[in-house]
Amino acid sequence: MKLKELVSGLDTIEVKGNMECDICGVQIDSRRVDNGCLFIAVRGTAADGHNYIGKAIEKGAVAVLCEDMPESMDERVAYVKVSN
């Protein structure tokens, strides 16, 4: 499925990158990310997924859904900022 289809119902604030990229899975745990995944950076009580965006990309994430855009962005990755 295309990233733009997956996020079409969300209230997106900002988008960077290719929204036409193919997504083969969705993960909130950076340790479980595989090639072609969308990584959702969840802010939890014990950990903040935003701290693991880099690790998720290293493991093959092609897109990131986040509340805050990272300071450093990989131009091969699509980033979608949402309010929550």
Give the predicted meaning of each segment.
Residues 1-84:
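N-terminal leader/targeting and accessory segments in enzymes
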